[in-house]
Amino acid sequence: MAKGKDVRGIVILQCTSCVRNDFNKESRGTSRYITQKNRHNTPSRLELRKFCPYCYKHTIHGEIKK
């Protein structure tokens, strides 16, 4: 029996301050985390505070498209 669309999907979180600083070339890279979310409970984009090793501080990481 084939399953339909999976409820718990894999999402990628990317540092928002590294993305903004990318235009100025102040950052050496961008921080990304891979996590899961339940699409029924949180249909909107996920935003979490995570540690960014490039900014050396806790920043907001937002969900990006695959």
UniProtKB/Swiss-Prot annotation:
Give a yes or no for keyword Chloroplast in this entry.
yes
InterPro entries according to UniProt = Ribosomal_bL33, Ribosomal_bL33_CS, Ribosomal_bL33_sf, Ribosomal_zn-bd
User: Where does it primarily localize?
Assistant: plastid
Keyword annotations:
Chloroplast, Plastid, Ribonucleoprotein, Ribosomal protein
Q: Which GO terms describe its molecular function?
A: structural constituent of ribosome
Signal peptide boundaries: none
Q: Which Pfam families match?
A: Ribosomal_L33
Keyword Methyltransferase assigned to the entry: answer is no
Q: Which GO terms describe its cellular component?
A: chloroplast; ribonucleoprotein complex; ribosome
Q: Which PROSITE patterns match?
A: RIBOSOMAL_L33
Single GO biological process annotation from the record: translation
Location within or outside the cell:
Plastid, Chloroplast
Instruction: Provide the family line.
Output: Belongs to the bacterial ribosomal protein bL33 family.
Enumerate the HAMAP family for this protein.
Ribosomal_bL33 (MF_00294)
> Which PANTHER family does UniProt cross-reference here?
50S RIBOSOMAL PROTEIN L33, CHLOROPLASTIC (PTHR43168), LARGE RIBOSOMAL SUBUNIT PROTEIN BL33C (PTHR43168:SF2)
Protein's name according to its UniProt entry: Large ribosomal subunit protein bL33c
What's the source species for this entry?
A: Liriodendron tulipifera
